[in-house]
């Protein structure tokens, strides 16, 4: 792969390979276009070992919205002798209406292709970041085992669980991005805030109230989303009882197909970004979503779940409604499982990573920490993938 990389530059998408990740081996790449049973397009890149190198195991990785066809793990695993399908789901780069249940169909499509079309003897499901909960949901809900092994690499407990951790609970009016309850304001000096880059100090009792209020805000958004879906279903049913073409029928018909969209302000406000005494580990202050002040991520462009359909919110970003929560799915993932956690991760706490390992239903499971490494494992990727490869060698051909 040809790189045109200015000195000291970094990719906006942290999971992209960097020049230092390029293996010496002449690995092969082939674009792949698959069609899911329900007609969705699944695009990816099929990475294979150098020409003439036989392989028997395929690694499959994806993410609900990220394009993992170019994930840093792909070339390193191919150089180690595995075929790799990194792919993007139907929701690539836009999870506004992301239904994890549909993304699972895309995972099934990818696994079927590597087994049936490419002849893989074994399949490894690799879940990185938000891909961990997607792969675990796919494995847990499949009628029979999808993979022969499961790897969680810097995986968080689920996108909805993550939202419970980062949503700003001080919002008092969902229509007003500047509404706030001062008692819950992360940026109020009375609560322990100091301007970046000074460290903040939040009282543990205040943090406990903050966490409870985060759940309450998610519950309020859930209620709005669920109400809109109920109303839509009721109007759809009502339209079927009316004479077609009339004013009442037309109104009910429109309401019966209406898709409610939610604008959700301030979704990146974890006190642990600013106070390293909260769940202490090896992380630095800040978040991968802002450079450098986390306040910019909470109030500024992009962010997470800022505009969502009602059903997309409930399926993906609600920590109270989404089924893609690894604490719920991992007990059903019984294939050999490896959990690799970078202890300098600003987004995933060590207790969470250890909790995933504990929740796993696999009899053969392992937990490995990469001391001091950050979420995207920049500068430590070869080390992390060596851990994965060493663990896979005795378990898959």
Spans of model-derived segments:
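Catalytic nucleophile-loop/oxyanion-hole region of alpha/beta-hydrolase
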Residues: 65, 90-124, 162
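N-terminal cap/lid segment of alpha/beta-hydrolase-fold proteins
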Residues: 2-57, 379-380
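Short alpha-helix in the alpha/beta-hydrolase fold that links the catalytic acid
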Residues: 165-168, 325, 335, 349-358
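Alpha/beta-hydrolase-fold enzymes
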Residues: 146-287
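Acidic catalytic loop of the alpha/beta-hydrolase fold
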Residues: 159, 344-348, 375
């Amino acid at each position: 792969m040809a790189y045109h990389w200015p000195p000291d530059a970094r990719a906006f998408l942290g999971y992209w390979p960097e020049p230092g990740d390029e293996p010496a081996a002449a690995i092969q790449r082939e674009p792949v276009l698959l069609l899911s049973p329900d007609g969705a397009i699944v695009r990816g890149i099929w990475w294979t070992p150098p020409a003439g190198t036989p392989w028997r195991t395929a690694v499959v990785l994806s993410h609900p919205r990220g394009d993992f066809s170019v994930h840093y793990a792909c070339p390193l695993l191919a150089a180690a002798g595995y075929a790799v399908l990194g792919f993007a789901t139907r929701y690539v780069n836009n999870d506004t209406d992301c239904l994890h249940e549909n993304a699972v169909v895309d995972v099934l499509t990818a696994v079927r292709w590597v087994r049936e079309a490419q002849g893989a003897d074994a399949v490894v499901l690799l879940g990185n970041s938000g891909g961990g909960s997607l792969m675990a949901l796919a494995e847990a809900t499949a009628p029979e085992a999808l993979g022969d092994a499961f790897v969680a690499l810097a995986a968080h407990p689920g996108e909805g669980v993550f939202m419970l951790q980062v949503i700003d609970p001080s919002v008092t009016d969902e229509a007003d991005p500047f509404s706030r309850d001062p008692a819950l304001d992360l940026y109020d000096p009375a609560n322990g805030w100091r301007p970046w880059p000074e460290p903040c100090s939040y009282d543990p009792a205040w943090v406990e109230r903050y966490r409870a209020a985060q759940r309450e805000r998610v519950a309020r958004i859930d209620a709005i989303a669920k109400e809109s879906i109920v109303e839509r279903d009721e109007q759809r049913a009502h339209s079927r009882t009316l004479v077609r073409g009339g004013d009442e029928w037309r109104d009910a018909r429109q309401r019966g197909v209406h898709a409610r969209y939610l604008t959700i302000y301030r979704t990146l406000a974890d006190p642990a970004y600013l106070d390293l005494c909260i769940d202490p580990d090896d992380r630095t202050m800040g978040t991968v979503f802002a450079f450098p002040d986390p306040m910019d991520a909470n109030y500024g462009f992009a962010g997470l779940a800022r505009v969502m359909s009602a059903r997309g919110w409930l399926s993906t970003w609600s920590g109270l409604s989404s089924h893609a929560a690894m604490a719920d799915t991992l007990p059903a993932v019984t294939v050999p499982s490896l959990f690799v956690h970078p202890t300098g991760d600003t987004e995933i706490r060590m207790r969470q990573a250890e909790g995933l390992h504990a929740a796993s239903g696999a009899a053969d499971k392992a937990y490995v920490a990469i001391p001091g490494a950050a979420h995207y494992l920049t500068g430590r990727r070869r080390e992390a993938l060596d851990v994965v490869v060493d663990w896979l060698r005795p378990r898959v051909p």
